[in-house]
Each structure stands twice: as structure tokens, then as C-alpha cells.
UniProtKB/Swiss-Prot annotation:
Cofactor requirement: [4Fe-4S] cluster; [2Fe-2S] cluster
Cysteine disulfide partners in this protein: none
Domain Radical SAM core span(s) in chain numbering: 45-274
SMART domains hit by this protein: BATS (SM00876), Elp3 (SM00729)
Pathway the protein acts in: Cofactor biosynthesis; biotin biosynthesis; biotin from 7,8-diaminononanoate: step 2/2
Any GO BP annotation: biotin biosynthetic process
TM spans (from-to): none
Protein name per UniProt: Biotin synthase
Species: Pelotomaculum thermopropionicum (strain DSM 13744 / JCM 10971 / SI)
Family: Belongs to the radical SAM superfamily. Biotin synthase family.
Binding site for [4Fe-4S] cluster: 63, 67, 70
Length: 321
């Protein structure tokens, strides 16, 4: 089964929805075959390189949206920090720190449905500074934006825009009611139209089914995104998803491998929640189709030491892009 599937994908043909759906029912004693297939596809399209990105929570809390997983939503009582846009100096310090520690990309992430014009002007100024004073690839995650803002970001030096779908269209209403799935899709399309690469993925462990994950993967394939962040839910006290169990490590790996087979040319990026969900199996993700990591801290939770991730990459005889 997997030999033929790998040959098909390497030749430029695509895995079908039904084939991807069937991976959810694969017996656990055959998961190593799935992981090997994902590794072979990954090596064919990307070699042995791993992309490392980092973020700064540039404006935190008081978001108007009701995303059920989010610590920064103003609809829920959580312990997430609340502060306005960080200063240029604070952001430059964090960017330089992450560059010195091995990150290749750096993103400003701001809470909220979108970004105000006044904050947007400040963000453009910050990106121009980062372009001049660092060698980092610059990414932005500023919520829902249109074509005009995307163009201005590109002109300021941003190369990639991040905006998650979060889940598939059919499950999205269970997760958010204050904006639509289509608004997220339109943001992705606007960024692409402006000439930006797009980083878009979602969160697994929200209560969605395997079919929902496959649907999300095919949505992303249709949109032609360059990078697919996979986050694993870490339930936050005070949110509607508090108390949900963590996904089993093998379920995370199964999902990552499926995304690799559906999106062979994209970066499959393991992000928030990987430490808690995968525990000691994090290296196995890089042998099961994953070829990118978010390093350092996340928005409201701590990551592990960047040095530990770099050692993991080196121990697997992989190289940083």
C-alpha cells in the first residue's frame, strides 16, 4: 500500500481524500509504515533540512473574538497577559536574541480580529527596522487583513503572512462564532495575491474527528499554502475547551504524517503544544513528515530551550534551512 502511495506522490500525483481518510483507521502496528512513507516523501521534496521560526507576542489579550481554545479572548476569564503593542526596542531585542539562538524566521503576532491603522503603521516601521538590523526572514500574524495591508507588509520587508484556518469549514462553527471561516480564507487569498507566502494551519485536539483533520488538510492544499503549522491543544483554564484530554503522541504523529502526504511540497511545522503532547517522542516527528519547528516560547505558553531543539536536529543528522 505505502510503496505505491509514495511512488504516486513522488511522481507528482496526489493522494485522494479517501486514501487520507483511511489513514485514520490504520492499525497502530502499521503506523511505522505510515511514518516511513511520510519521511520518504519529505526527503524527496525537501531533503534533510529543517526550518526554524520564532514569534513574539507583540500585543496580548482582550481579543473581541470567541475562539474556544484561546487564552487571549476577551470572552473568557484566563490568566493570559494583557498589554498594548510592544516598543520597537523590545521587539528588536527579542528578534536579535532568537536570531543568535538559531531561528531563521521571526514573526510579530498581535491579538485581535485585525489590527488598527495606528498600530499597523507602527508595525510597518518595526518591520523596516528588523529588515535593516537583522538577517531574519520576516513573517507577520496580524489577524484578518485585506489586500492593501498585505501589499504594505510586503513593501516593508515581510515575506510570509500567517493566518490559521484553525480547523475545517464544517467544524469551524463549533470553535468560533464571531467571524466566519470564509473571512479566514479571504485573508489567506489576499496575502497570496499581494505576493506574500502564506503560513496557515490549525489546532488539533479541539474535539474534531479524523475526517475534520483531513478536510482541513485538503482546504490548505487547495489554497496552496507554503507552510502548515500544526498546533496541539493545550487546554486553558477559563476557556470552553478547558478539561479536554491531550491527544496521544501517536495520534499527533499520525496527523502530521497525513498532512505531509496531502501537502508534499509544504513545510509541515510543529508548533504549540508539541512538548506536552509528544513528550519524549518529539524527535520521531522529524522522521514522520515534519520538517519545520516553531522554537522558543509561544503566545501564552512556554516552549523548551532552543538549544534542545537544535541538538535534536543535529542528533538526527538534519540541517537547519
Amino acid at each position: 500500500m505505502f510503496n505505491e502511495l509514495v511512488k504516486k506522490i513522488k511522481s507528482g500525483l496526489e493522494i485522494t481524500f479517501e486514501e487520507a481518510l483511511a489513514l485514520g483507521g490504520l492499525d497502530e502496528d502499521r503506523l511505522n509504515e505510515l511514518f516511513l512513507a511520510a519521511l520518504q516523501v519529505n526527503r524527496h521534496f525537501h531533503g534533510n533540512r529543517v526550518d526554524l521560526c520564532s514569534i513574539v507576542n507583540a500585543r496580548s489579550g482582550r481579543c473581541s473574538e470567541d475562539c474556544a481554545f484561546c487564552a487571549q479572548s476577551g470572552h473568557y476569564r484566563t490568566e493570559a497577559p494583557v498589554y498594548p503593542l510592544l516598543s520597537k526596542e523590545e521587539i528588536l531585542e527579542r528578534a536579535r536574541e532568537m536570531e543568535l539562538r538559531g531561528a531563521r524566521r521571526f514573526a510579530l503576532v498581535t491579538s485581535g480580529r485585525g489590527i488598527s491603522e495606528s498600530d499597523f503603521e507602527k508595525v510597518l516601521d518595526i518591520y523596516q527596522m528588523l529588515k535593516e538590523k537583522t538577517g531574519l526572514g520576516l513573517c507577520a500574524s496580524l489577524g484578518i487583513i485585506g489586500y492593501d495591508k498585505a501589499v504594505r507588509l510586503k513593501e516593508a520587508g515581510v515575506g510570509m503572512y500567517h493566518h490559521n484556518l484553525e480547523t475545517c469549514r464544517s467544524y469551524f462553527p463549533h470553535i468560533c462564532t464571531t467571524h466566519s471561516f470564509d473571512e479566514r480564507v479571504e485573508t489567506v487569498k489576499a496575502a497570496k495575491e499581494a505576493g506574500l507566502e502564506v503560513c496557515s494551519g490549525g489546532i488539533i485536539g479541539l474535539g474534531e474527528s479524523w475526517r475534520h483533520r483531513v478536510e482541513m488538510a485538503f482546504h490548505l492544499k487547495e489554497l496552496g499554502v507554503a507552510s502548515v503549522p500544526i498546533n496541539i491543544l493545550t487546554p486553558v483554564k477559563g476557556t470552553p475547551l478547558w478539561g479536554r484530554p491531550l491527544l496521544e503522541p501517536v495520534e499527533v504523529l499520525r496527523t502530521a504524517a497525513m498532512f505531509r502526504l496531502v501537502l508534499p511540497g509544504a513545510l509541515i511545522r510543529l508548533c504549540g503544544g508539541r512538548e506536552a503532547a509528544l513528550r519524549d517522542l518529539q524527535p520521531l516527528a522529524l522522521l514522520a513528515g515534519v520538517n519545520a519547528l516553531m522554537v522558543g516560547n509561544y503566545l501564552t505558553t512556554s516552549g523548551r530551550r532552543v538549544e534542545d531543539d537544535l541538538q535534536m536536529v543535529a542528533d538526527l543528522k538534519l540541517s537547519v534551512m
